[in-house]
């Protein structure tokens, strides 16, 4: 029992995956087919609204279906000629989503009117109104299905185009930075030479400072040695002179040498 259920689930999952893979492979062609189908449905609904003279509601009149036809023709132009233009795709998706919102609003409007008639009116006099609002709801349901089916692949394609444009912008910025770096090697050499000259000047200045400090230290040391030698010579001369002078001159109270 459980094995049969699991087998059925596997088969269903496999079929869903096959359909998904098929849609992904032929996504661009299916998108074009959806747009063509949208044009056909809008022409049919427009012709029905014109023949039946539906002028009772803004969202279910002939000019609403005419605007839908114009938008579907614009979608054919976009997908067959400008399929990589993100701005036109963005405009088409916004307009199509606006029509989908108005169609859903009109569906709730007419379905509400139909429920009111079915719940309040029991006599045969309301059969005409009942049939009228039923036709309206069926047309709006068909339009909502077509617009919803057409909106999803268009939105996914718009997202893909925007991602590709972002990647291209990033690659262009990287290439521009690389080109500027390649085209201006002289600036790099000049900056490198300036840095080398600055470093060499700093090294030379430091060496000169070291040499100057060592020279000054040697000079002061030699000068001190010379002064010390002069002082020693002066002291020795004083001693010699004091020994050579007579005692009377040295000291008046000193006795003469016998």
From Swiss-Prot:
Record field: compositional bias (Polar residues): 242-258
GO CC terms, sorted: membrane
Region annotated Disordered, chain positions: 237-258
Membrane topology annotation: Multi-pass membrane protein
Protein name, entry field: Uncharacterized transmembrane protein DDB_G0276999
Lineage start: Eukaryota, Amoebozoa, Evosea, Eumycetozoa, Dictyostelia
Keyword annotations of the record: Membrane, Transmembrane, Transmembrane helix
Transmembrane segments: 33-53, 59-79, 88-108, 140-160
Cell compartments where the protein resides: Membrane
